[in-house]
Amino acid sequence: MLCNRLHKAAFAARLRPRLPATVASCRQVHNSDGTISEKRIRNIGILAHIDAGKTTTTERMLYYSGRTDMLGEVKLGNTVTDFLQQERERGITICSAAVSFNWKEYRINLLDTPGHIDFTMEVEQSLGAVDGTVIILDGSAGVEAQTVTVWGQADRHRLPRLVFVNKMDKESADFDACLEDLEKKLSTVPVPLQMPIKEAGKLVGVIDVLSASQIIWDSKGKGRSYKAIPISDEQLHDQVQEKLYELIDLLSGMDDNLAQAIIEANSLENVKLNLVLDALRNCTLKQQIVPVLLGSSYKNVGVQLLMDSVLNFLPAPSERNQIYDLTNSQARIEGDFINVSTFRNDFVGKVFKVTHDKQRGPITMIRAFRGTVKKGSKFITATGGSETIQRIYEPLADEYREIESFGAGNIGLCAGPKSTVTGDLLLLASKLGLQTTIPDAVYFCSIEPPSSGQQSALDNALREIQREDPSLRVRYDEVTGQTVLGGMGQLHLEIVKSRILTEYRIDADLGPLQIAYKETLDEPCRGEWRAEKEIAGSKQSVYMDMTIHPSTASESNEERIVLDNSAEAQETLKLVRPRQMTFFRKGALAALQRGPKLGGQLANCTIKLHALTIGKGTADPFIMAASAQCIGNILANARCRLLEPDMFLEIVTPSEYLPPILADLSRRRARIEDVAPRGSANKVVTVIAPLAELGDYSTVLRTISSGTASVSMEPNGHSPLNESDEAQAMRRALGLE
């Protein structure tokens, strides 16, 4: 490689004196200047596995920036971003929260997101509003199950990221093991920019690889001040030099400008530090590398350098727009990526969160991609609704400070919109279609008010919560006459019940928790349906013929309904108007939401339409109803089977408890994927197991391991049940055992 041929010592000598001997507190008075340049804005999301330290890190950022006057603590329940009563009681983040603060003449808009898998929808929506992310790892645990999940979400949104290895004050923390985890489990290229400094087993600072300096924090001043000192230990100095050479060597193979500068200089002696920093930034924005920093937020070490790295290595909104901008000339949506260039200077924004305030009503959190939002601004949603902005507030969790406007690249809280839903696209231009991906529910249960007189209030509460959280499914069961909730997990549904009680004063009753089974066909099934009726003197008539096939195709709604392309079928189908076909599709897709066995969603199936004849004057709703009736009739005579939800588990346990844990898993129909060492005393077991067998697993695991093992789990698709297990599942679901 290039670097191995050049003079290393001279370059290292140029880097060492870059930092001053003492770095004073960098706390600033917050300034809400709305005219800040887009180049000086950073929109970031904080992502992590549960309990890795997201909220604690956020609290330090707010404190050191001068946005708050005290350090909030999760265990004391006084943090800014965990403001819900349920969050403070449980010590976890449930809803994403937005905060803005200034740091070194830059504006940082930060979203603190949940780490629990039940609230993954909060993370998904937040990522559509940010330009980069900070992934936080627990230094003693490395890459955990939910880390993999949020990393994948960031990949789907094409977000550049930094990694902050937190909790490095713990005795079991291992920075090198975390780097290895990042490389092996996430298939990324981690670039460590720091090394830990410990004294008497305590983390006191970090070694900055680029400047070859030690950064030491003042433990008595809540980490507000820190100083940079030269490295006096020769062996350590050589080790840092080697890390520096490895870094430049890696970057020179990715960045042409840096490689060319090294070749032209024929020596590292004349290569400027800013070229190395530029290469780091460019490679980070292209997602070729992931810079890795370390510290301990709780012990007030390393947070200011993390904030500096957010400014130095994560993109400004204008830089992210180069990723959002697509190459074609027409406005379109590709996943969650908005072609903002099509709209010129017209306003384009996205709703990433809706909350309800008792005094102000619905509060819509909007990320502006283009244009400016002012009081009185009118816009349309991608689905065609019209909205007006009445008031605009600056984000600071659940506090509100009114401002006049906010522009491209910024985040604002808006009062006035009445019908916007989390995930909506907002435009001052032509309508676009935008479909938010909502994960399937894995549990469901009935919900009832304490009296029939409160049913209307309960329905209203559920509508408001569903606006905030589209992953909550609400439907009315015509057979039982009950309202049924679907959620991402037991905790998700418990939080919904708790919010209904604390925020709406309704002591609702949740029924027994049921598993959300899906259903599928064993073999193709064909049927026809003729519906005729006279409504208000007008004759309504529809005839249709279709086959429902088992399929492994995508679950996209467009691909679940296909037309027979034979000449005979096309003769009748070509007479169907596009609007009539739209209502046929609506009825068909609605019918596929309820299977014949347990009323579960039909999965892995495709409808092929052979014939559709619609009488003159037939109303669109009649077509939709006939479509649903035809499919219901076909499914009633079809051979179907149940699909049960599976979970991916990651269990961390001391080695001595491994045998009884594996024995217990085997009784739960679990499939052991891997058993790997973690450190010298622990094992990590990765497992796929049916959700139906995991109802009491956390409690049993604690008992088996005397409280020393931990488990995290996340959905892992569905798999078919054999006849015996299906019969047992149906008996459980019907309350027969």
Curated annotation (Swiss-Prot):
Record protein name field: Ribosome-releasing factor 2, mitochondrial
PANTHER family noted in UniProt: RIBOSOME-RELEASING FACTOR 2, MITOCHONDRIAL, TRANSLATION ELONGATION FACTOR G-RELATED
Transit peptide: 1-36
Superkingdom of source: Eukaryota
Recorded GO MF terms: GTP binding; GTPase activity
Principal location class: mitochondrion
Localisation: Mitochondrion
Cellular component GO terms held in the UniProt record: mitochondrion
Positions of the tr-type G domain: 39-318
GO BP, sorted A to Z: mitochondrial translation; ribosome disassembly
Pfam families to which the protein is assigned, alphabetical: EF-G_D2 (PF22042), EFG_C (PF00679), EFG_III (PF14492), GTP_EFTU (PF00009)
Described function: Mitochondrial GTPase that mediates the disassembly of ribosomes from messenger RNA at the termination of mitochondrial protein biosynthesis. Not involved in the GTP-dependent ribosomal translocation step during translation elongation.
Residues bound to GTP: 48-55, 112-116, 166-169
NCBIfam families, per database record: small_GTP
The family this protein is said to belong to: Belongs to the TRAFAC class translation factor GTPase superfamily. Classic translation factor GTPase family. EF-G/EF-2 subfamily.
Keywords: GTP-binding, Mitochondrion, Nucleotide-binding, Protein biosynthesis, Transit peptide
InterPro entries (UniProt xref): EF-G-like_DII, EFG2, EFG_II, EFG_III, EFG_III/V, EFG_V, EFG_V-like, G_TR_CS
SUPFAM superfamilies in the cross-refs: EF-G C-terminal domain-like, P-loop containing nucleoside triphosphate hydrolases, Ribosomal protein S5 domain 2-like, Translation proteins
